[in-house]
């Protein structure tokens, strides 16, 4: 089954019931049903930047075209003659001059920012605040299924304690959870640190072909995406692992944030235990306090 969306003037629509064996005419009929644009005047584009597909052969199969699960098809109505193959925005000239940029997509700081961010990039830029509970449960299931790999030495608590802990909505995700999600999605997850301006690449040696990026300021995670400024073209959140340009652009964004002091030094920031009101300094003291007392609800002072 192909998981596709189409974007037209009347909004973005989920396209269901199509597979790689579906023919072009089935695709066009589905688009007409969702957008109201007649089959014979549809201009269908895919990719980033988007380029037009030659879909004149209605009996051809979708597997013969560069259409893959997760894609968003851009659909316009052709008025007279065919337009240039790359025309995602209305410009004064015939050439496409807009340069894609990498940006941070801010998500809420609600203890579940890691899970929200990973879901956002893996779903192609779909924000779903309700996903965190499901992802926490998924991680707990994976950990519980392999107590040897996920031992107390790895988790910092027993396997059973960890599974109970990660399901709570007041706990934070970190490197362990990113590693688990990388394996689950079969995707390299790159975390760009704004304090050190480095990239931690989870799944780097696993041979994955896909890459997604998060930015991390010492406490909070946000997803990174590539967008065309001033355009309605959907953001790109999944990249090839051979695309090192995107890593360089992400590091530039992190360096800019560092110069603006947009990070939290987790070794020196002031915290307070919200259970017993004990004052603490830095991540190390917070972890030790949690280990001694079982308290895990901290607030920044």
Curated annotation (Swiss-Prot):
GO BP annotations listed: endoplasmic reticulum unfolded protein response; ERAD pathway; macroautophagy; protein K11-linked deubiquitination; protein K27-linked deubiquitination; protein K29-linked deubiquitination; protein K33-linked deubiquitination; protein K48-linked deubiquitination
Region of interest (Cys-loop), residue spans: 107-113
His-loop: annotated segments: 216-220
Catalytic activity: Thiol-dependent hydrolysis of ester, thioester, amide, peptide and isopeptide bonds formed by the C-terminal Gly of ubiquitin (a 76-residue protein attached to proteins as an intracellular targeting signal)
Gene Ontology MF annotations: cysteine-type deubiquitinase activity; zinc ion binding
GO cellular component: cytoplasm
EC number: 3.4.19.12
UBX-like, as annotated region: 5-83
InterPro entries for the chain: OTU1_Ubl, OTU_dom, Papain-like_cys_pep_sf, Ubiquitin-like_dom, Ubiquitin-like_domsf
Residue span of region Variable-loop: 166-176
Subcellular location: Cytoplasm
Pfam families in UniProt: OTU, OTU1_UBXL, zf-C2H2_OTU1_C
Predominant location: cytoplasm
Protein name: Ubiquitin thioesterase OTU1
Species this chain originates from: Danio rerio (Zebrafish)
Name of the coding gene: yod1
